Structures are given as C-alpha cells and as structure tokens.
C-alpha cells in the first residue's frame, strides 16, 4: 500500500519545510501544485524536492482557485497508483496525529473514504508577547517550538480515498462515486493561524480567491490578523504529551444517511460504481 498526497498550495513558505518533513515520514509521494504563490513557496518546494525523492513538484499556475484543481494532479499521476493505494488531500497547514499508514490499514475493505477530526489550532492572547514588530511584515519560519498550542476539535473533512482503476475525477471537488465513508476519523492538527504576517497573508489570499469566484471562504472575511486572535479560556492546551481532547459531540456528522450508505454498499459491491 502506498499513499499519494495531493498538495495544492499557495503562499505557505513559512510552514512548508516543516510540513514536508512531517508528511514525508508516511506519504510515499507528495505532488506539489502551486496555485500562484508570491512568497517563494514554489521555489522552496523545488529546493526540497532535490533533497527528498518523495516530494514531486507538479507545476505552478495561478488560475482561479477551485477544489477541482486537485483532479489535475490525480489525472496526471493516477497510472502510478495501483488497487490498494490511497490518495490524500494533503494541505500544507495540516500535520497528522495518527499515523496514516497504520490507520488506513485497519479501514474495513467495504469503506473507501476517511474523514478527519480537525484539531483547529489558534493564536491566542498568550502567544502575542513572543512576536516581534517585524513578524507583522514577514512570517517567521514555523517550527515545532513556535507553532500555536491552543486548539479545539470542531471540524471534519474528507482527507483520504482508496484508489480504484475505474475512478474518474473531472471538474468536481472529489472523484465521482468516491465511495463509502469509514466511521472512524483520523486526527489531524490544522495549523492555519501561525503568526501575524502569515494570518494577514492568508486573509489576503482568500479574499482574492473569493473575488475570483470561490464561494467557500465565508469564514475568512476579517480584514485584520488581530480579528483572528482567539481567547485561550475557550480552548484546550496542547502540552506536547501526546494527549488530545476530541469530543465527538463537537464534530459535525460525517456519515451519509443510512439509505445512502446502503445504496453505496450495493452499487460498489456489485461493481456498478468504481
């Protein structure tokens, strides 16, 4: 079993080195599609690729952001995958807590899709004293020592799907008939807010994407990085001891309705769908 990671990235140079180092521990191939970075992300990815054979720069192209752009990577490299492999939506601001190869190995054969339990890490008022004035202009490189420590587990998204030779991925966010969702979720740290300059750049990038027609950044309408600073009293603290608080009641439901799951079992089981 191999894992193929599709990394659609834009302006993540501060965390890219850390992210690729962590992801290369378990992801067999990391395909980088740069969506028009202006902060050196693409150049850094190419530099790292010369040192790490698992990192494969696909291309840099600044077309309007859409989730279906990941399908371009899938279509380009799908022949390198075999039945039993997995594909991962591999975002540059995410680091996995659970070991993906071990986790995926125990997913029931009847299931094809794995969703995440997203631990959303925030900058809080307790982080602000460590930042210098220049950190509002240029994002410092993210390291395990400087990453935010406060989080709440309240989000969930699809992250992995099984490769099948008949899968099709056209102009959609995910492949057609991607499959049945596994009940168990894999835990991932979502390190989306890391420093004042990085937050400001993130907001600007998403404002531009929204202006160019992307409809799913409604949670990123703030104008200042200071509006993203969270109150630590409402969050859990990551003490670095490997213990995390994940309350299933705070996560959105990720499973299909029963009738949909039953239909998927029949259609995939009989081979009508890939």
Where are these regions (language model features)?
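Hydrophobic targeting segments
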Residues: 1-7, 23, 29-33, 188
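Short, well-formed alpha-helical segments that are part of the catalytic scaffolds
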Residues: 12-28
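Short, structured coil segments at secondary-structure junctions
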Residues: 26, 48-51
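A conserved acidic beta->alpha catalytic loop
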Residues: 34-47, 62-65, 91-92
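Conserved donor nucleotide-binding strand/loop of the catalytic core
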Residues: 50-68
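Catalytic-site signature of metal-activated, phosphate-bearing donor transferases
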Residues: 68-74, 97-274
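Active-site nucleotide-sugar/metal-binding loop of Leloir-type enzymes
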Residues: 71-86
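Short beta-strand-to-loop acidic/aromatic patch adjacent to the donor-nucleotide binding site
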Residues: 83-97
